[in-house]
């Protein structure tokens, strides 16, 4: 069966790990988050990498996503890993930022939220930003609020 599949004009394209950000993350208005191990500050091998095929800088930044502790339905702390964990952390950060902005300035849009979070990202020494793995750096909501406080 496998031989029949490979007969004829079937060939495999040379893959490129630097174009693994897909829809909906490859859209300008969407916040796209890479995920990393907070213990050793390394991007997960399975985290999407950018940029997009149209050269948008994606991911926008990275959030913790390896062995992140949270409470399960039984009230116990458990570790979870994956892009969904980083997405949940990012969504929580955006919700807190949105609440603050609504009380202060009105209703922000998704691009404003993303740009303000980018403004507060942490960047490691010796790396050029933005880059294909980390985007603009590591999510740091405290730093975002600190920057906004000083404006």
Task: Locate the predicted segments by residue.
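Hard-cation-handling environments
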Residues: 1-6, 10-11
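Short secondary-structure boundary micro-motifs
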Residues: 6-7, 44-46, 52-54, 113-115, ...
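Extracellular S/T/G-rich loop segment that most often corresponds to the catalytic His/Ser-adjacent loop
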Residues: 14-95, 99
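Hydrolase catalytic cores
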Residues: 65-129, 138, 146
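Short polybasic/polar patches that bind polyanions
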Residues: 132
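Secreted peptidase-domain scaffold signal
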Residues: 144-151
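Substrate-binding/active-site groove segments that recognize
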Residues: 59, 139-140
């Amino acid at each position: 069966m496998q031989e029949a599949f490979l007969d004829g004009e079937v060939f495999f394209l040379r893959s490129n790990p630097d174009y693994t950000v897909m829809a909906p993350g490859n859209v300008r208005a969407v916040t796209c988050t890479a995920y990393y191990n907070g213990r050793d500050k390394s991007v997960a091998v399975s985290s999407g990498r950018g940029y997009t095929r149209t050269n948008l800088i994606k991911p926008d930044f990275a959030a913790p996503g390896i062995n992140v502790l949270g409470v399960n339905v039984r009230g116990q702390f458990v570790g979870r890993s994956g892009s969904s964990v980083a997405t949940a952390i990012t969504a929580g950060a955006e919700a807190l930022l949105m609440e603050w902005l609504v009380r202060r300035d009105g209703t922000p849009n998704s691009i404003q939220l993303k740009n303000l979070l980018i403004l507060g990202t942490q960047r490691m020494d010796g790396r050029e930003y933005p880059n294909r793995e980390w985007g603009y750096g590591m999510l740091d909501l405290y730093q975002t609020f600190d920057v906004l406080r000083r404006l």
